[in-house]
Amino acid sequence: HAGARAPAGPRATRPLLLGTYTSEGGGGTGIGTAAYDTGTGAITPGPVITGVENPSYLAPHPSGATVYAVSEQGAGAVTAVAIGPDGTYEVLGSRPTGGSGPTHLSVHPSGRWLLSANYTSGSVAVHPIAEDGSLGERTDLVTHSSPPPGPGQGGPHAHQIVTSPDGGHVLAVDLGTDTVYTYRLDASAGTLTEVSRAALAPGSGPRHLAFHPGGRFAYLACELDNTMVVCAYDPATGAFTPGPGQSTGTGSGTSYPAQPVVTGDGAYVYLANRGHNSLTRYAVEGGGAVLRLLDTVPVGGDWPRQLALSPDSSLLFAANQRSSTVTVFGVGPDGSLTGAGAPFPAPVAVCVLPLP
């Protein structure tokens, strides 16, 4: 008997992955790897996972054993990367998305399906995920052929695809058609069936949404009319009901708001404003039904394209595309944001993914 071992506390550093555009001048050569200090937010660089072109968005598998990347290019693709217990990474292979310019992907909570959004071609795709995390042949491709595109849009532009917190529906946000589509996913066939659609203001350019943890409200950033929209979601029917556009606190004109995130307790929402180079803070009230604008905070970088909270919502990471940096903030219990250290250099940083 070797004596009782004290239970291991949470590890002081956890992995952090970085998306980039490999095709841009000054861009990275693949998916960046790093580690972050779970207390201070300090980031330490690691090697690059090469062999993935334009990995502009990254999504984890619920098991923690795999991560997925889009290749945002003409012949769109999605790639699976295995994460070894020792922290090493191995590319498992890629599959075509059936469209062009995929900008977003997410894993269905069952862990069995990968959902991706082809921005340029305006379609959404489904791929099966095997036991080892690798991807099978695409099982569906749905093009947002109606309604007609909004003002100034040449066609549909699917920008995001996510599963509702209850797991019952898949929602796709289309910037070109100013529409959020609700689908049911056939969990055995991997096919999508549209059940409803929600119209946003013409020309608003809906881009990304984030659900409140209560599962009945979502917050949608519209990048062309510079608004945040509180949307009600009905888990029974999948109906998605947008409210009026609300201020981002960034003044007149558009600041191309990019992505909202919601703290784990559902108390605060943060929004990245690319043109304004700021983070808007909102307090969540009314059980998720109301956003109260608090203020805007400088992001400390240029063109914040994507935000991510650490798993415990104690840290906020911002990927700043034009300054090629990641800035980190400590998140207070009162929703305050406090800069944590110097910006971390990351070439053409367009996505940051802190892993649990």
Located regions from the model:
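Short loop/turn segments immediately following the C-termini of beta-strands
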Residues: 21-23, 72-74, 119, 129, ...
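Beta-rich, blade/repeat-based domains predominating
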Residues: 27, 52-63, 98-112, 146-166, ...
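Short loop/turn segments immediately following beta-strands, especially the blade-tip
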Residues: 34-41, 80-87, 126-136, 183-191, ...
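Blade-loop segments of beta-propeller domains
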Residues: 44-111
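A short beta-strand motif characteristic of beta-propeller blades
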Residues: 44-50, 90-96, 139-140, 146-152, ...
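Asp-box/WD-like beta-propeller blade repeats and closely related beta-sheet repeat scaffolds
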Residues: 88-160
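Blade-level signature of beta-propeller repeat domains, shared across WD40, Kelch, NHL, RCC1
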Residues: 322-327, 334, 338-356
